[in-house]
UniProtKB/Swiss-Prot annotation:
Coiled-coil ranges (or none): none
Organism, as annotated: Corynebacterium glutamicum (strain R)
CDD domains hit by this protein: ArgRS_core
Family: Belongs to the class-I aminoacyl-tRNA synthetase family.
Predominant location category: cytoplasm
Subcellular localization(s) per the UniProt record: Cytoplasm
The reaction(s) this protein catalyses: tRNA(Arg) + L-arginine + ATP = L-arginyl-tRNA(Arg) + AMP + diphosphate
One function term, GO molecular function aspect: arginine-tRNA ligase activity
The name this protein goes by in its record: Arginine--tRNA ligase
PANTHER family: ARGININE--TRNA LIGASE, CYTOPLASMIC, ARGINYL-TRNA SYNTHETASE
Transmembrane stretches, start-end: none
Subunit structure: Monomer.
Enzyme Commission number: 6.1.1.19
Length: 550
């Protein structure tokens, strides 16, 4: 019985108790909260349901708790239900009910933890979207890891997810990139506000090798050639780096297509027609303050050029027109102002503003021996995705970026993540999985199997701790999806690995050399198999491998 199963049982029991006393059942919460007590001696789980509803039905909380305890204790799944304090209920599961969690995991396998509670969502998840003017820096790398994990978590919760990369190929930064490449090809210094780094020289040389005539063309044609080829080569490098990192996208959306297709003009006309765009001093302004923004925004400047927000508005419209009812933008730390303006754009176009969510990620700092690592071999000024992977590997890089909430800045100590010790979180979790695989191999050699195991034998305190931790996984996945916080999965994996290691140190899973195989060995092997499956499921959700040997 998982915490969710117990919550359902408590709710059903509460309905029966209130109904039998002709009390109002509508006051019961939609979901009963079930938590593990801080002191394990108080029981397996606790709930404050009696305190929540007693006053609403005109009853003393302890009296209501007493009625609930008596009714729950009559259920075969409950070993005991005791009242604490003003009306808390401390519940201890029967051994067989605890064992049901193990059986459930083994039956569900790779789908344990999944649900369909977000099946009503068609999500457009846009992340990374780095400009094609250089390699992906650490901020973009954080989104590459977190965004991919969030997509996995949302899909595990039943949502349809489209992973999208917004390709910024429209704007002055592309012109500066092209001029930087051209200067490098000519052997000239990097232009002011240009891009430097070894990668600029490499791309420039590749363009000249591919087009020997490039520098002999008319100046405008030369610049356009370096622009088009440079952007394409840089973007191919970005896609290759992301793929190696384990992050792929369903859609690569070109910003320039919004202007070339007329989508920007169409969106502007919609806003003019519905009165949400007004003219002032030759410019056209969005009435964004009417939709929660702190100021109205210029959409078309007085010289007739579109402001940057014009593309954002057209892009919002395009996402909704493709059938997405939730559009998640994962943006950098300097994009807080985008939250209100994107929601305002959606509302002004006639869409629900809650269909737009903006997640803001904070900075990432790389450290070695307590000192900042600032320089990249190829990029020249910033540390890149490739640098991080080269330093600590893909699994450690992804895990280090995912395990912390994105709304806080992150320091990554390279020495810690390079180490093969329990201090390294990803090593600790992966070692737990590898140890479990080793146990399974040894069990096969000894002829021990979990088939037909009597799971009611799992009564040791460490067994109970492990079973209860396993039972929490579905709720952790649900919370990670609902709150858009995949770091919860990584932290759970660490907790599960730690609980398993403590169980392993206290309980012999397989018979020793002088022992015969006993029913408890099969039961513990089943518990180990369930733990292995759950760890593998958690690692999959963060996009990290689950090694069988280490």
């Amino acid at each position: 019985m998982t915490p969710a199963d117990l919550a359902t049982l408590i709710k059903e029991t509460a309905v029966e108790v209130l109904t039998s006393r002709e009390l109002d059942t509508s006051v019961l919460p939609e979901q009963v909260v079930v938590e593990r007590p801080r002191n394990p001696e108080h029981g397996d789980y606790a709930t404050n349901i009696a305190l929540q509803v007693a006053k609403k039905v005109g009853q003393n909380p302890r009296d209501l708790a007493t009625w609930l305890a008596e009714a729950l204790a009559a259920d075969d799944a409950i070993d005991s239900a005791e009242i604490a304090g003003p009306g808390f209920l401390n519940i201890r599961l029967a051994a067989a009910a605890q064992g049901e969690i193990v059986a459930k995991i083994l039956a569900q396998g790779e789908t344990f933890g999944n649900s369909d509670h977000l099946s009503h969502l068609d999500v457009n998840l846009e992340f990374v979207s780095a400009n094609p003017t250089g390699p992906i820096h650490l901020g973009g790398t954080r989104w590459a890891a977190v965004g991919d994990s969030l997509g996995r978590v949302l899909e595990a919760s039943g949502a349809k997810v489209t992973r999208e990369y917004y390709f910024n190929d429209h704007g002055r930064q592309i012109d500066r990139f092209a001029l930087s490449l051209l200067a490098a090809a000519k052997g000239e210094p990097t232009p002011e506000d240009g891009y430097g780094g070894e990668y600029i020289k490499e791309i420039a040389e590749a363009i000249v090798e591919k087009h020997p005539e490039a520098l002999a063309l008319e100046p405008a044609a030369t610049q356009e050639l370096f622009r088009a080829e440079g952007v394409e080569m840089m973007f191919e490098h970005i896609k290759s780096s992301l793929h190696e990192f384990g992050t792929d996208f369903d859609v690569y959306y070109h910003e320039n297509s919004l202007f070339e297709s007329g989508a920007v003009d169409k969106a502007v006309q919609v806003l003019k027609d519905n009165g949400n765009l007004y003219e002032n001093e030759g410019a056209w302004w969005l009435r964004s303050t009417e939709f929660g923004d702190d100021k109205d925004r210029v959409v078309i400047k007085s010289d007739g050029d579109a402001a940057y927000i014009a593309g954002d508005i057209a892009y919002v419209a395009d996402k909704f027109s493709r059938g997405h009812n939730l559009n998640i933008y994962m943006l950098g730390a300097d994009h807080h102002g985008y939250i209100a303006r994107l929601k305002a754009a959606a509302a002004a176009l006639g869409y629900k503003p809650e269909g737009v969510e903006v997640l803001i990620g904070q900075m990432v700092n790389l450290l070695r021996d307590g000192k900042a690592v600032r320089m990249s071999k190829r990029a020249g000024t910033v540390v890149t995705l490739d640098d991080l992977v080269e330093a600590i590997g893909i699994d450690a890089a992804r895990y280090s970026l995912i395990r912390s909430s994105v709304d806080s800045s992150l320091d990554i100590d390279l020495g810690l993540w390079e180490s093969q010790s329990s201090d390294n979180p990803v090593y600790y979790v992966q070692y737990g999985h590898a140890r479990l695989c080793s146990i399974a191999r040894k069990a096969e050699t000894l002829g021990v199997t979990e088939e037909g195991a009597d799971l009611s034998l799992l009564t040791h305190d460490r067994e109970g701790d492990l079973i209860r931790t396993l039972g929490e996984f579905p709720a952790v996945v649900k919370a990670a999806a609902d709150l858009r916080e995949p770091h919860r999965i990584a932290r759970y994996a660490e907790e599960l690995a730690g609980t398993f290691h403590r169980f392993y140190d206290s309980c012999h899973i397989l018979p020793k050399a002088d022992e015969d195989t006993a029913p408890i060995h099969s039961a513990r092997l089943a518990l180990a198999a369930a733990t292995r499956q759950t760890l593998a499921n958690a690692l999959h959700l963060v996009g990290v491998s689950a090694p069988e040997k280490m």
